[in-house]
Regions:
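Conserved Walker A/P-loop ATP-binding site and its immediately adjacent core
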Residues: 1-10, 214-220
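Short basic/glycine-enriched coil/helix segment immediately N-terminal to the Walker B
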Residues: 26-28, 44-60, 76, 237, ...
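Inter-Walker segment of RecA-like/P-loop motor cores
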Residues: 9-45
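Conserved RecA-like P-loop NTPase helicase motor core
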Residues: 37-38, 61, 235, 242-314
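Conserved nucleotide-binding/hydrolysis micro-motifs of P-loop NTPases
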Residues: 37-40, 68-69, 84, 92-96, ...
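SF2 helicase catalytic motif II
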Residues: 37-39, 50-88, 93
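Interdomain helical connector at the RecA1-RecA2 junction of SF1/SF2 helicase-like NTPases
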Residues: 99-207
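Conserved C-terminal RecA-like helicase domain
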Residues: 17, 24, 30, 168-271
């Protein structure tokens, strides 16, 4: 919501705007930004001299961002309540949008009112394309065999995979391995590929803004730990070069704002879900998929974090 309002104001500076999540008393702006839950609360509680402020005819237009999600069952009251035209926006491929989402907008399933494909946006100069750098590691591809590990890794293996009855599996196949935190050597290899092949700024002296998509919080913290061991010289003056940004943080939005600033650290954000969708940082040059993504819709949302234009960056 914060980013949406910020970008809207930059395009229409003379339009009065309000973010109801942060500005509790500014209800008279011409353009209102809100989460679904905040708006539902305001409909019930906000009043003026004539009674309820947000009547069914209060708005001339209602825009629903991230309309690919299963929003109707949870927030159908909002869509049924306001009688203004409803516009839904999503970056999800049209064949991945759920049927009930099309029904909200009175559309035939799989046929949006208007579609603008990534390839066309790149051709028209509104977005940039992506280039893949595939990195395969032995453990992820083949699994782990206990007898092939070093003594140090055997100790980690025993702590991680020992059964309740004390027995130890001889090997963990690649499919099962993806349910556990990746080992330190694998993380080192992935980080090495990033630091070697990732796009750079400052005349090639510094890795560009990067999002690493981690499997879970423990995995993210492990990646950060290994990064700091491998590249301690990059964090200077108390400013971390890499940082975990997820819902375990107390001030997540502040961390996102710092990452979004080209002149501030961190340069690398290690994220668990929080930066997968909905964040707009044009300076992001590198995306590291350090987890399996089973949803095609989510995958393209994640790809979108790195397709923004940023003239003069490199």
């Amino acid at each position: 919501v914060t980013q949406a309002k910020r970008n809207f104001v930059s395009l229409l500076p003379d339009l009065s705007c309000s973010n109801l999540v942060e500005e509790k008393d500014n209800y008279t702006a011409h353009c209102i930004f809100s989460t679904y839950q905040t708006m539902m609360n305001c409909i019930d509680s906000v009043r003026d001299d004539n009674g309820k402020l947000f009547t069914c005819g209060h708005f001339d237009l209602v825009i629903c961002d991230e309309a690919h999600r299963s929003i109707y069952n949870k927030y159908r009251d909002i869509f049924n309540y306001f009688d203004a035209p409803l516009v839904g926006l999503t970056a999800t491929p049209k064949d991945e949008i759920e049927k009930n989402t099309y029904e909200i907008f009175d559309l035939e399933n799989g046929v949006p009112t208007y579609g603008y494909e990534l390839a066309q946006a790149v051709k028209d100069g509104y977005l940039v394309d992506f280039v893949t750098v595939e990195s395969k590691t032995k453990f992820i591809e083949e699994g782990i065999a206990y007898d092939e590990l070093s003594d140090k890794d055997k100790a980690v293996y025993e702590d991680t995979f020992e059964f309740e009855d004390g027995k130890l599996p001889e090997r963990i196949d690649s499919a099962a391995l993806n349910t556990w935190v990746f080992n330190e050597d694998t993380i080192k290899q992935v980080l090495h590929v990033l630091m070697r092949d990732g796009l750079k700024v400052d005349y090639g002296q510094k890795i560009g803004k990067t999002i690493i998509f981690a499997k879970n919080h423990d995995h993210a913290e492990k990646i950060l730990e290994v990064f700091n061991k491998q590249y301690p010289e990059l964090s200077k003056n108390g400013q971390p070069f890499a940082k975990v940004i997820d819902n375990y943080m107390t001030y997540a939005q502040s961390a996102i704002d710092e990452f979004s600033d080209a002149d501030k650290m961190p340069q690398i954000a290690i994220s668990v879900d929080m930066l997968d969708t909905g964040i707009d940082v044009p300076e992001v040059l590198n995306l590291v998929f350090f987890k399996k993504v089973m949803s095609k819709a989510k995958f393209w949302q994640m790809i979108g974090r790195g397709t923004r234009l940023c003239p003069g960056l490199i």
